[in-house]
């Protein structure tokens, strides 16, 4: 695939009043240093569909007024030897930013698009980006603008950041702070209200207002006991996972022991958020519960087919009647489920920071939950939902995410970056996949005057052959898969299975409702 780029020759650097290139220096946080370790060199990529033809000059001018005013996006990473030169310190150093060095306007040759398949061309383009590291002599971000009409967008923008700039939640919030509502260009995007209080705490509050103080006290004590027990169990499982507890070697589990840097394939699919909300409201769950349950069903369908194809390939069961499933009866398949621990940093806070130079909390504030998927075919697809909800409800009544965050900081400070990176890498290598779910705007938004059709963020660089990201936007949900193509060569079939599972569960919910009305 041949891609030619052009750059604006005009001077677009952001100049400070001070003539010195280096304005200030700030040490990298321990988490940021881990993301630069060879075992854990992670990047965030977000593919953004645009409704109209992109005007690069407008985008560049908008970036000058917003994104590069953020300290991390106008700082480069500098390593300095200390003492005997065996130890190095890494710092963020403010620098002048030439925006056109970071904005790549791709001159796409239409004859290179095989069979006119622009979607496949986009996937190849993004996959190629995973093999090219960012230039550390400049701030660690890029924006690719593609004049490419795909099945779901008129043009496409691809944002690429190094994960050391911040966690996925803060980076996406920063991107959203650069955007405005299409209906009102002066207004920031609106996110759905999040009620962070759990059902457990709501019940406790209700009990405290009731007549039975004794019952309320019993509930409080029982809840505290379960919190401690769940946290201890989860902590022991995490320690065991770090040391020896491995997932089953399934067709979707990768091996990153010998190759730390691989070409990854990124694909996405957009489905109706209304379908997910219908299931959510009927089953009295959250959107995240539904997404986990559907993912469990989709993974079960995909693995069943992969195991069946494997048996056919080796010639097993050719003369006998095919069993109901070719999967092993007991499969341990766990996901590292990312949890945002950040006190709410709103889009407004980030917009004010870029406009006025104010400060707000920034960095990598994420914990992990080890979530076990119950893999298997079910006669009743709603069993996948109930099982996923039961597990995640127990995980919510645990301090596992906070504990992994605190333990990570302790290991970093006590043993250093290299040891911490190896421990995290080992823990993730013993699980199968990563999973995250981000809440997006509820109204159409524009990227410097360019209306957006979808956003598909993803991450690569960690030791998983499969990463699933979910991003809501307006009335749709975009599923992004990052896969190792040597392990999962058919990611679109996995997306097909996910979508079919969603429709199967939706049909089961509607059938149950119709029976209850009869």
UniProtKB/Swiss-Prot annotation:
InterPro entries: CAT-like_dom_sf, O-acyltransferase_WSD1-like, O-acyltransferase_WSD1_C, O-acyltransferase_WSD1_N. It is found in: Cell membrane; Endoplasmic reticulum membrane; Golgi apparatus membrane. GO terms for molecular function: diacylglycerol O-acyltransferase activity; long-chain-alcohol O-fatty-acyltransferase activity. Residues 1-29, 185-205 are annotated as: Disordered. Residues 1-17 have a biased composition (Basic and acidic residues). It catalyses: an acyl-CoA + a 1,2-diacyl-sn-glycerol = a triacyl-sn-glycerol + CoA; a long chain fatty alcohol + a fatty acyl-CoA = a wax ester + CoA. The chain crosses the membrane at residues 214-234. Residues 1-213 are cytoplasmic. The active site is at residue 163. In the N-terminal section; belongs to the long-chain O-acyltransferase family. Keywords: Acyltransferase, Cell membrane, Endoplasmic reticulum, Glycoprotein, Golgi apparatus, Membrane, Stress response, Transferase, Transmembrane, Transmembrane helix. The keyword Protease does not apply. This is Wax ester synthase/diacylglycerol acyltransferase 6. Expressed in roots, stems, leaves, flowers and siliques.
């Amino acid at each position: 695939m041949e891609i030619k780029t052009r750059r604006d020759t005009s001077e677009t650097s952001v100049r400070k009043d001070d003539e010195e290139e280096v304005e200030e220096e700030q040490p990298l946080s321990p988490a940021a240093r881990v993301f630069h370790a060879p075992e854990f060199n992670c990047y965030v990529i977000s593919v953004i569909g645009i409704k109209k033809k992109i005007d690069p000059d407008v985008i560049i001018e908008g970036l000058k007024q917003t994104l590069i005013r953020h300290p991390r996006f106008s700082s480069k990473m500098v390593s300095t030897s200390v003492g005997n030169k065996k130890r190095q310190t890494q710092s963020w150093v403010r620098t002048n930013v030439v925006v056109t060095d970071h904005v790549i306007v791709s001159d796409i040759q239409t004859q290179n698009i095989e069979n006119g398949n622009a979607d496949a061309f986009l996937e190849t383009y993004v996959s190629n980006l995973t093999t090219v590291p960012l230039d550390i002599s400049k701030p660690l971000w890029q924006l690719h603008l593609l004049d490419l009409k795909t099945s779901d967008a008129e043009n496409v923008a691809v944002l690429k950041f190094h994960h050391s700039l911040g966690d996925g939640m803060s980076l996406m919030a920063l991107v959203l702070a650069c955007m405005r509502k299409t209906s009102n260009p002066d207004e920031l995007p609106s996110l759905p209200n999040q009620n962070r209080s759990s059902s457990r705490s709501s019940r406790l509050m209700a009990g405290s207002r009731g007549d039975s103080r004794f019952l309320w006290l019993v509930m409080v004590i029982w809840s505290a006991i379960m919190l401690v027990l769940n946290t201890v169990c989860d902590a022991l499982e995490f320690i065991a996972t770090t040391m020896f507890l491995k997932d089953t070697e399934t067709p979707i589990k990768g091996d990153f022991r010998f190759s730390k840097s691989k070409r990854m394939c990124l694909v996405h699919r957009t489905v109706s958020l209304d379908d997910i909300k219908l299931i959510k409201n009927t089953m009295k769950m959250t959107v995240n519960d539904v997404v986990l349950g559907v993912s469990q069903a989709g993974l079960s369908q995909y693995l069943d087919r992969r195991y069946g194809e494997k048996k056919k390939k080796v010639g097993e069961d050719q003369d006998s009647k095919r069993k109901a499933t070719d999967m092993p009866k007991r499969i341990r398949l766990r996901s590292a489920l990312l949890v945002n621990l950040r006190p709410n940093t709103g889009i407004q806070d980030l917009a004010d920071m870029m406009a006025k130079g104010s400060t707000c909390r920034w960095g990598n504030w994420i914990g992990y939950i080890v979530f076990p998927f119950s893999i298997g075919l079910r006669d009743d697809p709603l069993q996948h939902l109930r099982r996923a909800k039961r597990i995640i409800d127990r995980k919510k009544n645990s301090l596992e995410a906070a504990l992994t965050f605190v333990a990570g900081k302790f290991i970093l400070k006590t043993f250093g970056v290299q040891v911490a990176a190896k421990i995290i890498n080992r823990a993730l290598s013993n699980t199968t996949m990563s999973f995250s779910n981000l809440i997006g705007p509820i109204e159409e938004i524009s990227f410097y005057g360019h209306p957006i059709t979808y956003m598909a963020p993803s991450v690569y660089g960690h030791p998983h052959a499969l990463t699933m990201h979910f991003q809501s936007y307006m009335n749709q949900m975009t599923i992004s898969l990052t896969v190792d193509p040597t392990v999962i060569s058919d990611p679109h079939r996995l997306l097909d299975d996910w979508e079919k599972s969603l429709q199967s569960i939706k049909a089961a919910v509607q059938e149950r409702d119709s029976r209850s009305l009869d």
